[in-house]
Amino acid sequence: DGVEPIPRFDDLVTAFPDMRLNIDPKADNSVEPLIAALRTHHLLDRVCVGAFSDARVTRFADEFGPDLCLGMGPREVARLRLSSWRLPVGSFRGRCAQVPVRRGRVPIVDNRFVAMAHQLDIAVHVWTIDEPDEMHDLLDLGVDGLMTDRPAILRSVFEERGLWSAGG
């Protein structure tokens, strides 16, 4: 209802020192302040940064190298998809692919995509999954993470599968 204040990033990481964060800097002007905050709060072991902009992803890769969990940009995701069809595409910097199940009519996440990603030690996080049947299907494929707008449903799916601990 808009009555609670939106927390500042600095307050969030201070209030929840053990929380892992997935961060998508949505605008170019957010990159440098985020780089500064990651350094100030020593967050490299707690965050994964990914973006829909190859330029933003590259900026974080250049700044932190392999010390930062880096999500793949759109071009790298496309190369990983091609790699799942056994096409030679070179190496990857991103340590996780954060992707939709499909892009338009083009499927992205399938058993070949997940298998190739895992063969390359790349985690697969899929968004935005809100239906329990689809959650189960993706977990059966072996995806490493699901992003949802319905966390209570995701928790229920995890509980059904014995994947939810009392600590959350």
Please give the residue ranges for each predicted region.
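Short hydrophobic/aromatic-enriched beta-strand-loop microsegments
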Residues: D45-G50, P66-E76, G145-D149, G162-G168
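Short gly/pro/ser/thr-enriched loop/turn and capping motifs at secondary-structure boundaries
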Residues: A55-T58, V77-L80, I153-R155
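Glycine-rich beta-to-alpha transition loops that act as phosphate-gripper elements at the mouths
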Residues: A51, P74-E76, V126-P132
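C-terminal active-site rim and adjoining tail of enzyme catalytic domains
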Residues: G2-I6, R81-G168
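Metal-dependent phosphodiesterase/phospholipase catalytic core, i.e.
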Residues: D1-C69, P88-L120
